[in-house]
Amino acid sequence: MKILPLDPSDQAVVAIPARIGSTRLPRKVLLEINGKPMLHHVIERSQKAELVTKVFVITDNEEVFESVGPTGAKALMSDPECSSGTARIASVIDQLPGGIIINVQADQPVVEPKLIDGIIQKLVNTEADISTPIWQIQTTEQLSDASVVKVVCGHQG
């Protein structure tokens, strides 16, 4: 992928909403994978994206907040009443620098840095206000699985 330079006003940051209260897998963002919390893997992969200037973790939990310290990311506290990760990011939007904010979920320990860069490039090079990576559903099980997010696209994607 060809990386184009960003205008300073287009600074891109990754915002990782992280909550501890998962119902299907409690405390999942702090569960260890290869000796470190899942959240740390997400942070490290996000930091490897060439166009990302800073990574933020937004949480309402003190333990998650404290765990961010050694990673080089910055932790921000959000309102515990936020109903979604997007709402969590919106609650601290004034504390996030830059013109581009990429929402990376805290349970994506193998997120590809090139995917993050591709989203940033798409936002810089088009008039799009938002970009969401999607994948085609591969099985009928995925189609009926409530935990698999579905997206309906128009003719232009």
Walk through the language-model features, giving the residues of each.
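Short beta-strand segments
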Residues: P17, N103-Q105, P133-Q136
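Short, high-confidence coil segments that cap the C-terminus of an alpha-helix
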Residues: V52, G98, N125-D129
